[in-house]
UniProtKB/Swiss-Prot annotation:
InterPro entries: Chromosome_partition/occlusion, ParB/RepB/Spo0J, ParB/Sulfiredoxin_dom, ParB/Sulfiredoxin_sf, Plasmid_partition_RepB, Plasmid_RepB, RepB_N. Pfam families: ParBc, RepB. The keyword rRNA-binding does not apply. It comes from Rhizobium rhizogenes. This is Putative replication protein B. Belongs to the ParB family. The lineage of its organism: Bacteria, Pseudomonadati, Pseudomonadota, Alphaproteobacteria, Hyphomicrobiales. One of its GO terms (molecular function) is DNA binding.
Length: 312
């Protein structure tokens, strides 16, 4: 039934935008609720205790690349650690523990010098990675490259069935992730970081560019440079891509010359064999004549300069 006499199709763009934002927020909240439900189920029947952060080791399979946790630090500083982490008794170090999920919370609480609220539960290696993967998938806070590298690490130690269950993906997408990680030097992805917002197509483009260079190590070295490391992670990715793309001049593609006010005056095409300058007579007819008249004088000036340099 129309709302206030206006059908859905007749609603203004602002109304549609508000509705879309509302739907997105509800979907995000639903995912967070499901992630918390996973945590509750895994911790079901277990008491929350406080542990010394120094007694807890990270998971044996890293899922995250080190990133900014300022927002989480502020939240825990002001409100405390609201959600406990899940740990298991360390399989080889008595008296110590290993994280199943909650690495960022552990890091934040450690930096604040607080005890860690945790649930301790006996878990097999397989249960740890499946719990770790499912919680990450519901929160959707891992970037593409973090997910791909996590899958790659899991694939070294577990069957494809366990990896697929942990990642909640099919065999085809898993294969694509594994091939992509294999194609990228680990030093390069470490230097770039998590790259929020950079999806699989962009990482695939980087892998294809890397395949064409003679020294991938030099690309990683550039990514580790002080200049690039000063940028946010996603900007580091863009900088690396830009450094690998051939310039328009190198590819023989035309460049446009224009005046400060934007008037197009010429198109320049360069290659190893020749340089072509194409002037639009319709846009600047007098300039075309001016250039033709001055080419001989320009060449004479060039020749004289060469003679002078040889005489020095």
């Amino acid at each position: 039934m129309p709302l206030l006499g206006v059908t859905r199709k007749e609603r203004d763009p602002a109304t549609k935008l508000t509705a879309n934002i509302g739907n997105a927020l509800r979907e995000q909240n639903d995912r967070l609720s499901r992630a918390e439900e996973i945590e509750r189920r895994l911790a079901e029947g277990q008491a929350v205790i406080e542990l010394d952060a120094s007694s807890i080791e990270p998971s044996f399979v890293q899922d995250r690349m080190r990133g900014d946790i300022d927002g989480l630090l502020t939240s825990i500083r002001e409100q405390g650690q609201q959600v406990p982490i899940l740990v298991r008794p360390h399989p080889s170090q008595p008296g110590r523990y290993q994280v199943a999920f909650g690495h960022r919370r552990l890091r934040a609480v450690s930096e604040l010098g607080l005890p860690v609220r945790a649930v301790v539960r006996e878990l097999t290696d397989e249960q740890v990675v499946v719990a770790q993967g499912q919680e990450n998938n519901e929160r959707e806070d891992l970037t593409f490259i973090e997910k791909a590298r996590f899958a790659h690490r899991l694939n070294r130690q577990f069957s494809r069935e366990i990896v697929i269950a942990a990642m909640s993906i099919d065999k085809s997408n898993l294969s694509k992730m594994l091939l992509l990680v294999d194609a990228l030097p680990s030093e390069l992805t470490d230097a770039i970081g998590a790259a929020p917002g950079v999806g699989r197509p962009s990482w695939q483009q980087l892998a294809e560019l890397i395949e064409k260079v003679s020294s991938p190590a030099d690309v990683a070295k550039y990514a580790m440079s002080e200049e690039v490391q000063a940028l946010p992670s996603a900007e580091r990715f863009k900088a690396v891509i830009a450094s690998l793309k051939p310039s328009r001049v190198a590819r023989g593609l035309p460049e446009v010359m224009a005046t400060p006010d934007g008037t197009r005056i010429a198109q320049v095409t360069q290659s190893k064999a020749k340089l072509e300058i194409t002037i639009d007579r319709k846009a600047t007819p007098d300039f075309a004549t001016f250039v033709l008249d001055h080419v001989p004088a320009l060449y004479q000036a060039y020749h004289a300069e060469n003679q002078r340099k040889r005489g020095e």
